[in-house]
Amino acid sequence: MSRYRGPRFKKIRRLGALPGLTSKRPRSGSDPKNQLRSGKRSQYRIRLEEKQKLRFHYGLTERQLLKYVHIAGKAKGSTGQVLLQLLEMRLDNILFRLGMASTIPGARQLVNHRHILVNGRIVDIPSYRCKPRDIITTKDKQRSKALIQNYIASSPHEELPNHLTIDPFQYKGLVNQIIDSKWIGLKINELLVVEY
């Protein structure tokens, strides 16, 4: 299955707020179809919705998500927690968390168009796994800096997770450590995703 490119608002109405997909919020009580659907939810539906939340928030394909679940299963510790840590340490997600992009698809585009350097080298793979002490900067070109400057200026200044630091004047971010589970911005039960 390929990456989802359809209407984002439909997914938000169905699954709830997905800050990585879009910053828009649905109005409460505005969708009459949703009110008709509010029957008893089966266990399968609950697990499926949790998995879809994760997929659409991080912009993953089904195959990519399965690969991450497989890697998390082999690692030490809780599979669900390790899965979320793996997803949070992706380069596109870290750019989103730093405020250098308004959404994760926007961050993915910045990386694909070669505007981002990690430790002084161009990285054009959005799924690149960042490690502690990685320095994320933009290219020295004026166009790259202008893009990042627009994103930083237009984004609401939310509290930065403690595993990241940003210098907005030098367009530079630093990964301090692996993310702590309380800083994950998505309300999700990761165990249901692993069970699915």
From Swiss-Prot:
Alphabetized CDD domains for the sequence: S4
Alphabetical list of InterPro entries matching this protein: Ribosomal_uS4, Ribosomal_uS4_bac-type, Ribosomal_uS4_CS, Ribosomal_uS4_N, S4_RNA-bd, S4_RNA-bd_sf
GO cellular component, one term: small ribosomal subunit
Domain (S4 RNA-binding): residue spans on this chain: 89-150
Domain of life per record: Eukaryota
Chief place of localization: plastid
GO biological process, one term: ribosomal small subunit biogenesis
Region called Disordered, residue ranges: 15-42
Gene Ontology molecular function, alphabetical: rRNA binding; structural constituent of ribosome
Places the protein is found: Plastid, Chloroplast
Keywords, in A-Z order: Chloroplast, Plastid, Ribonucleoprotein, Ribosomal protein, RNA-binding, rRNA-binding
Role summary: One of the primary rRNA binding proteins, it binds directly to 16S rRNA where it nucleates assembly of the body of the 30S subunit.
Subunit comment: Part of the 30S ribosomal subunit. Contacts protein S5. The interaction surface between S4 and S5 is involved in control of translational fidelity.
Protein family (similarity comment): Belongs to the universal ribosomal protein uS4 family.
Protein name: Small ribosomal subunit protein uS4c
Organism: Iris pallida (Sweet iris)
Organism phylogeny: Eukaryota, Viridiplantae, Streptophyta, Embryophyta, Tracheophyta
Gene encoding the protein: rps4
